[in-house]
Amino acid sequence: MTVVNFSKAGRALAGLFLCAASMGASADIILGHSGDLSGTSAALTTDYVRGMNAYFDDINKKGGVRGEKIKLVSLDDGFNPDKTAENTKALIEQNAVALVGFRGTANMLKIVPIVQGAGIAQIGNTSGAKSLRDPYVPNLFHVRASTTDEIEAAVNHAWTIGINKIAVAYQDDAFGKEGLDALTAAMQKRGAKPVAVAPVPRGTVDVDKAVDAIAAAQPQAVILIAQAKPNAAFIKAYKAKGASAQFMVLSVSSGLHAELKEPAAGTIVSQVVPYPFTELGNAVVREYQTIISATPDKKFSYNSMEGFLNAKLVVRALQKTPAPLTRAKLISTLETFTSEDLGGFALTYSKQSNLGSRFVNLTMIRADGTFAR
């Protein structure tokens, strides 16, 4: 597979045009990706793309889709919604048949009108936002469960083990605010409310005010609705104050240990894809492990597993779409996936639903960075 991957947006766009020009007469299937390759979630984005690349490479080695090779063009948006919109327009103009694996709720909300105006599918993204699911948003096809599903699982677990004094620090953007709403609703169902609520500015690690506000409330648990870097900064600062609590984070922060190391131990992380390390009873996990083991970076991870599943869904849809391939035909095919099993991971779509999966599993970070279930 040819992968065009640029860490600077200006350079990326220039490279994209050159790449597209060279591909103009070919029958290659062009897929477009925009993500944070240089900002606070760069490591997670890169790992996600690694999973997509691994699967696309494997398909191309086997002859591609009806003899056509898949080409992924990946552009850096630095987690900036305006840059995501710019990249999206460029990818559409250069004949991408679908957009895959985007990151960020604000980023996704920014591109919805662009995607719908172009009649192109956006397949798989890392946002669990309700606003991208309910009411139904045409042209989006989610792979992961929603943030609401993740938070409900976390709160339910807390209640089960006798924790009901919960505080929340949230990323001050659409993602964080929707997560806060989901947490508030989950606690209201149980006749409670958060004991403290504190925002963290988007795209920063400015956590001191949030740490002070939450530590003063002495919660039993703190749910962090943010990316890995600010979450790591929060936990480090919170522990430095001598305060203690059970920390709980969402799947977008599964790279927490890489940022925080041993102090991340004991943190509960909700996961939205199957356990990628030893769950050999799951067919798609076995396939993932076999393919990833044949790549230069043989490391198994949740982020690359999610990217892998996204790529597998894309290829399944491409294979089932009748030739000649068009954006509209691909969307129509995806809408027929009312119960599409990727090998132990099922996805559900229709003309009025883009939910995909509701799979959530809770894990705990060990001191060495591995996950216990």
Task: Locate predicted features.
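Beta-alpha junction/loop-to-helix N-cap segments that form part of ligand/metal-binding clefts
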Residues: 30, 43-50, 63-131, 201-204, ...
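N-terminal signal peptide c-region/cleavage motif recognized by signal peptidases
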Residues: 22-26
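Extracellular/periplasmic Venus flytrap/periplasmic-binding protein
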Residues: 86, 129-131, 138-242, 276-286
